[in-house]
Regions:
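A short Gly-Trp-Pro
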Residues: 1-137
Length: 137
């Protein structure tokens, strides 16, 4: 993986730069992520808040109470509606992997909310697998 990594929303009004290697790449199989992405799971990249730099349009915050009971705030483009990332929490930002300009290096190693995963999905042996949320995050 080459640094910095860049990305943004579908219309290009929001852009970002990641200046440090990510701490983690993960998949989330919760029903909210399935609905939000119209897919079987979402994929996120966890980066230090200090290494994530937004530019362009101001993202619009959307809040929702997750299956865990925690309120999550998604930052979306006010123009195209792309879900770019979450608000910073605990010193990190969870960036939506599909918004990266280069996704060739992505390899998730942690899978959360697998009790809701689609039955046809097989998770790799050796990866960290949690039926619900990762208790460390």
């Amino acid at each position: 993986m080459k640094l910095p990594q860049t990305g943004g929303c579908q219309c290009g009004k929001i852009r970002y730069e990641i200046t440090e290697a990510p701490q983690l790449v993960y998949t989330c199989h919760c029903t909210d992520c399935q609905r939000l992405t119209s897919s079987a799971f979402s994929m996120g990249v966890v980066v230090a808040e200090t290494a994530f730099h937004l530019s362009g349009s101001e993202p619009r915050p959307l809040q929702r109470t997750a299956d865990s009971g925690r309120t999550n705030t998604r930052l979306v483009c006010p123009e195209c509606g792309s879900w770019v990332c979450g608000t910073p929490r605990d010193g990190v930002v969870r960036v939506r992997a599909g918004t990266l300009d280069d996704t060739s290096w992505l390899r998730p190693t942690r899978h959360i909310w697998t009790r809701s995963k689609q039955p046809w999905i097989t998770l790799p042996q050796g990866d960290e697998i949690f039926e619900v949320s990762d208790p460390r995050r």
